[in-house]
From Swiss-Prot:
Keyword Ribonucleoprotein: yes
Lineage of origin: Archaea, Methanobacteriati, Methanobacteriota, Thermococci, Thermococcales
The gene coding this protein: srp54
Gene3D superfamilies (alphabetical): P-loop containing nucleotide triphosphate hydrolases, Signal recognition particle SRP54, nucleotide-binding domain, Signal recognition particle, SRP54 subunit, M-domain
Protein name, UniProt field: Signal recognition particle 54 kDa protein
GO molecular function, one term: GTP binding
Alphabetical UniProt keywords: Cytoplasm, GTP-binding, Hydrolase, Nucleotide-binding, Ribonucleoprotein, RNA-binding, Signal recognition particle
Keyword S-adenosyl-L-methionine: no
GO terms of biological process kind: SRP-dependent cotranslational protein targeting to membrane
InterPro entries for this protein: AAA+_ATPase, P-loop_NTPase, Signal_recog_part_SRP54_M_sf, Signal_recog_particl_SRP54_hlx, Signal_recog_particle_SRP54_M, SRP/SRP_N, SRP54, SRP54_GTPase_dom
Amino acid sequence: MVLDSLGRALSNALKKIARAGSVDEALVKEVVRDIQRALLQADVNVRLVLKLTKEIQRRALEEKPPAGISKKEHIIKIVYEELTKFLGTEAKPIEIKEKPTVLLTVGVQGSGKTTTVAKLARYFQKRGYKVGVVCSDTWRPGAYHQLKQLLDPYHIEVFGDPNEKDAVKLAKEGVEYFKTRDVDLIIVDTAGRHKEEKDLIEEMRMISEEIRPHEVILVIDGTIGQQAYNQALAFKEATPIGSIIVTKLDSSAKGGGALSAVAATGAPIKFIGVGEKIDDLEPFDPARFVSRLLGLGDIQGLLEKFKELEKEVEFTEEDIDRFLRGKFTLKDMYAQLEAMRKMGPLKQILRMIPGLGYSLPDELISVGEERLRKFKVIMDSMTEEELMNPEIINYSRIKRIARGSGTSIKDVKELLTQYNQMKKFFKSMNKRQLSRLARRFGM
């Protein structure tokens, strides 16, 4: 989970209010101290922390709750509102207005820029845009091959020449090339060789003059914490069309510091990197981000995940009729497990469900994820006939499947039990109920 330790600490602070018999000044001050401690441990700037928590305390002690809202609920709302304001208030998506729209990405060495370019290309491809990627990184020989390796499986074309040494020429040629390929979006990757902001900005200016991008994106490493302020500020002052992506928020205790530092400059954060996989890039929406961080869920985010799934897994009316007649196969179950895997880590999905927040132990979530992985491995060891007709799987077949998948007989039996329960569940539903469920879960 992104900023897991910060989220838990903030969620625990709010629980003190929710569980208290009554709310007085002493409790408010105690909760404010907890919030201060949590933010400082996430490497948020001291001055920013004090300013934020002073406002939370003032509002919590002075404001009267509106009619129908309890004092506890009002204070939780205040914390949510102030944290959202702290991180930028509203979402600022990248807009594809012209065809082609050109995005130029820059970033210092080690920021995760090249991987982020691939994630960005995949993000827009999933939303129906035709994307072309230009590799103008002449400094790192492996950059072009890295982009090819990441994007070839998704049939996203990469333009580049590992032998060319002129980055500006390469960027210009790449943009001109994709203008003839009828793409909607061109993303230009640059060299990440600069350690200092001024060198980075100079290269950005040179390439910008040649390719005239619609937007310039600075990729910032979330692990640098509040040091991100200087990078973001220098960048914001250098270009009026700049936006920011903060990476590696899944692996850093300093991610809160990086996010708040960038937000403090006023530079718009467009996306955040939340994992290593190519789909682990999220549009940054402060309100939804804070809601998840506080354990309050993100229903909109969950619905968007389901919407993405609709394109990945399609079950027809005939399939639904078949399920209702009890003709649900292991192959159908496999398709559902694949769909769940594509939604992202189980922990990330569970955090989107209101009320669940941080209540499930990590160990339990890990067991759930491991179980889903194991089920897929077991089904990969089955024959087509067994997947289509699970009823033929007798004890000798179970032994063979267990041996072939490197699992135990007990694991195979557990999968078959789970399958039979799902089959029974579908058979017990009427067509309208199942159609509604199918639409919701991308079936």
